[in-house]
UniProtKB/Swiss-Prot annotation:
InterPro entries referenced in this protein's UniProt entry, alphabetically: Creatin/AminoP/Spt16_N, Creatinase/aminopeptidase-like, PepQ_N, Pept_M24, Peptidase_M24B_aminopep-P_CS, X-Pro_dipept-like, X_Pro_dipept
Protein residues bound to Mn(2+) 2: D244, D255, E420
Binding site for Mn(2+) 1: D255, H336, E381, E420
Family: Belongs to the peptidase M24B family. Bacterial-type prolidase subfamily.
Gene Ontology biological process terms in this record: proteolysis
Top-level enzyme category: hydrolase
Cofactor note: Binds 2 manganese ions per subunit.
SUPFAM superfamilies, per database record: Creatinase/aminopeptidase
Gene: pepQ
EC number, as in UniProt: 3.4.13.9
Keyword Manganese (UniProt): yes
Matches recorded under Pfam families: PepQ_N, Peptidase_M24
Name listed for the protein in its UniProt record: Xaa-Pro dipeptidase
Natural source organism: Xanthomonas campestris pv. campestris (strain B100)
Cofactor: Mn(2+)
Length: 441
């Protein structure tokens, strides 16, 4: 993506954001939208700060992710104003003055102290919708996070602009570069920690810059859904590798998962291939007007069909779903919205005026219950796992006969399988953001 084209896309993106903000402010009865970037937070009984995490509402407007004590101010009919904190400091590296393809579209004021922002903020704070954490308060400018404004903006965030899709594609490219390096490190016999370091080096981002903690799981560690321990010694023998890792680009996240078998001729590889084929079909079902809840239920049936074919369960997919057996093997949701945040907001929103669409009974970890519409980007991440705690529940609930325990014992040392792509819902066929990048040379 060239700089000029990003500039053009950003200009259009900003027009969309201002139109949304105009409507949100009208609904809430406010004259100004004020968004602090956030503040630094210090560890308890210490003078060391935590890694800074920018306010997602702030980085929706400008691609600044490491700028505490900065502000975005928008008043309908005017250009957005960015109050950019650039302190005098010899202890730390001072951020460069704003530059690049976005600055021509905003009015920028540079401040040297956090307090210097105050006279640049709207004087009548009661007329401001101020979106941020309480710690960002400055004088009378105290975040109020009005529901009418947040509900509208969060709901609309599901619909990505061409600019957002462009930078999300960049995040895909970075992450796939890391995934390739990670697979090579796995094939070379590296430890989880070594694989993680290979990933970070290939992406060019450290743990504080990545959108979430890398899941680098060898062998049975793949049965821990959010395994982040990073063992320093590679297990012997090396059987399997599950990697769930993304990258950041201009404030937007990617989220990709792959699973590999050490032995390409093993039954575990055959199981991976079956889940991979099913995952592609699930991604192709991302269509406008489809209920994501139904996609999730359909995923359960598809995965249980695979387990039945492999002799791991002894009952029909429908019976496994009805009795809760399927949840022991596939205990998480099919996916979620993604964008500025890995688990992007408003996945349960009934409308842009609030309300909530509940999860289906028996599926407490599904993160998206909305109808799919053009512009949404969702993850599709089916998984099959061999988790002792959940399989013990199957026995306790009287469904032991539904499972072939000898087959479970054969697959348990591999941990589990998860395969995840990002998919754009369009007016027609969906666009898979992830697969073409892996397929490229």
């Amino acid at each position: 993506m060239t700089q000029p084209s990003l500039s053009v896309l950003y200009s259009d993106h900003l027009r969309t954001l201002t139109a949304r903000a105009d409507q949100a402010l009208q609904r809430g009865g406010f004259d100004h939208l004020v968004i602090p970037s956030g503040t630094t937070h210090y560890q308890l009984f210490d003078d060391r700060d935590y890694p800074f995490a920018v306010n997602p509402q702030f980085k929706a407007w400008v691609p600044l992710t490491r700028m505490p004590h900065s502000w975005l101010v928008y008043t309908p009919g005017k250009r957005p104003t960015v109050i950019f904190y650039q302190p005098f400091d010899y202890w730390h590296v001072v951020p460069d003055a704003p530059s690049g393809w976005w600055v021509e579209h905003c009015d920028i004021h540079i401040i040297r102290t956090p307090e210097a922002a105050l006279p640049l903020l709207p004087a009548r704070t009661e007329r401001c919708a101020i979106l941020g954490e309480a710690a960002s308060a400055l004088g009378a400018c105290v975040p109020n996070n009005p529901a009418a404004v947040l509900d509208f903006l969060d709901y609309q965030r599901a619909f990505k602009t061409p600019y957002e899709l462009a930078v999300m594609r960049l995040a895909q490219q970075l992450a796939v570069r890391g995934h390739r390096a990670a697979e090579a490190a796995f094939r070379a016999g590296q430890s989880e920690f070594g694989i993680h370091m290979a990933y970070c080096s290939a992406v060019g981002q450290d743990a504080n810059e990545l959108p979430y903690g890398n899941i680098i799981a060898l062998n049975e560690h793949g049965a821990v859904l959010h395994y982040t321990e990073l063992g320093r010694q590679a297990p012997q023998p090396l059987r399997s590798f599950l990697i769930d890792a993304g990258a950041s680009a201009h404030g937007y996240a990617s989220d990709i998962t792959r699973t590999y078998a050490a032995d390409a001729g093993s039954e575990f590889q055959a199981l991976i291939d079956a889940v991979d084929a099913a995952q592609l079909r699930m991604g192709n079902a991302v269509r406008a007007g489809v209920d994501y809840k139904q996609l999730h239920v359909d995923a359960h049936l598809s995965l249980m069909g695979i387990l039945h074919d492999f002799g791991i369960i002894t009952v029909s997919p429908e019976a496994a779903l009805a009795t809760g057996v399927s949840a022991a093997f596939f205990p998480h949701g099919l996916g979620h919205l993604i964008g500025l945040q890995v688990h992007d907001v408003a996945g349960f929103a009934a409308s842009d005026r609030g309300g909530r669409i509940e999860r289906p009974d028996g599926h407490p970890y599904l993160r998206l219950t909305r109808m799919l519409e053009p512009g949404m980007v969702v993850t599709i991440e089916p998984g099959v796992y061999f988790i002792d705690m959940l399989l013990d529940e199957v026995k306790k609930n009287g469904h032991a006969a539904s499972v072939n325990w000898d087959r479970v014992a054969q697959f348990a040392p591999y941990g589990g399988i998860r395969i995840e792509d990002e998919v754009v819902c369009t007016d027609g066929a969906p666009e898979n953001l992830t697969r073409p990048v892996f397929a490229a040379p």
